[in-house]
Amino acid sequence: MSKSNPNKQSVELNRTSLYWGLLLIFVLAVLFSSYIFN
């Protein structure tokens, strides 16, 4: 852990978790739509 810029570290972590959340929502939407249309 570097104490020079901890704010940038948390911003990177938030961005990564945001991308994972969007990916999860996208996958769930695809599965749900395929379940509905079949």
UniProtKB/Swiss-Prot annotation:
GO terms under cellular component: chloroplast thylakoid membrane; photosystem II reaction center
Classification via SUPFAM superfamilies: Photosystem II reaction center protein L, PsbL
Membrane topology: Single-pass membrane protein
GO biological process: photosynthesis
Key words of the record: Chloroplast, Membrane, Photosynthesis, Photosystem II, Plastid, Reaction center, Thylakoid, Transmembrane, Transmembrane helix
Compartment(s) of residence: Plastid, Chloroplast thylakoid membrane
Domain of life: Eukaryota
Transmembrane domains' residue ranges: 17-37
Plastid as UniProt keyword: yes
InterPro entries from the UniProt entry: PSII_PsbL (IPR003372), PSII_PsbL_sf (IPR037266)
Subunit and partners: PSII is composed of 1 copy each of membrane proteins PsbA, PsbB, PsbC, PsbD, PsbE, PsbF, PsbH, PsbI, PsbJ, PsbK, PsbL, PsbM, PsbT, PsbY, PsbZ, Psb30/Ycf12, at least 3 peripheral proteins of the oxygen-evolving complex and a large number of cofactors. It forms dimeric complexes.
NCBIfam families from the UniProt entry: PRK00753.1 (NF001972)
Function of the molecule: One of the components of the core complex of photosystem II (PSII). PSII is a light-driven water:plastoquinone oxidoreductase that uses light energy to abstract electrons from H(2)O, generating O(2) and a proton gradient subsequently used for ATP formation. It consists of a core antenna complex that captures photons, and an electron transfer chain that converts photonic excitation into a charge separation. This subunit is found at the monomer-monomer interface and is required for correct PSII assembly and/or dimerization.
Recorded family membership: Belongs to the PsbL family.
Protein name: Photosystem II reaction center protein L
